[in-house]
Amino acid sequence: KKLCEDINRLNNSEIACLLPSKEFCFIDTESISREYEHARLGTLTKSITNQCKYIIGGVEAILQKTIPKEVLLDNTLKISTGDNITLNELSKLLVNNGYVRAEKIEGYAQFSIRGDIVDIFPPNEENPVRIELWGEDIDTISYFDIDTQRRIDSIDCVTVPPAKESVFNKDFLLSKLKSLADTHSGDFQNYVIKDIQRLNSQLADIPTIDRYFSILYPNLDDTIFSYIDGFVCISEYDDCKNYAKNLWIQVAE
C-alpha cells in the first residue's frame, strides 16, 4: 500500500492502483464483507479503462484467480447522457451484477431509485453517481457527496463494473450444481442443494458463490496476469517464491 501511495505522490496523480487479496467465503454466514473484492474490482476496472498504469499487489493477491478480462468487459455498463433505458431494466442489470438496492447510498455496490433518480456507487469510483432521467432518457449524470447527498460535479458518462467477481449465467450454474448434487453426498451435497433452491427462488446471488469459483472460471490463467500486457517487476524474488510455494500447498490442502 505504501509503495502505491509513494508512486502516486511522486506523479501527483493516481497512476498506481492497489490489488488486495480476496477473502473467499465457503461456508454459510450471516454477513459477508466484500470490501477487498470491491477494491479488486475497482483496480481491474481502472486497468481496462486505462486509468491505471501500475498494479501493485502481494503474492497472494497476484496469484488468486479473478474474473476474466473478457467477462469483466462484457458485464461492465457504460452509461452516458442521452442514453435510453428503463428503470426496471437498469435495476435488473445492477442486481444481476451484485449491487444491492437500498433506501439511501451508504457504501460501495449499492444503488437506490427514487422517482426518476438513480444513485449508484460503483467500486471504481471515489464518490457515488446520480443519474437523472427524463422519461426513459438519461438527462444528467453527476457525482454526489455520500454524507450530504448533494451533487458535486457533472459528468457525461460513467463506467459501472460488476460489484462481484463471480458473475454467472443462472442456467449454466444450475446445470453444474445439479451435476454436483448427483455425484456427491453428505454435507457438500446438502450445501449444493440449498444453493440450487436459492437460485430457483429467483434470488440474484448465492452468498457462498466462492465455492464454485473454479466452475465459473476453469482457466488457471484467469489471474491479474491476463490483464497485463507490459512488464512485471518482482521485489524480493526469493521471498515471493517461497511464499507462493507455501500458498499453493495451503490451497491444495
Positions of PLM-derived features:
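ASCE RecA-like P-loop NTPase motor cores
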Residues: 1-253
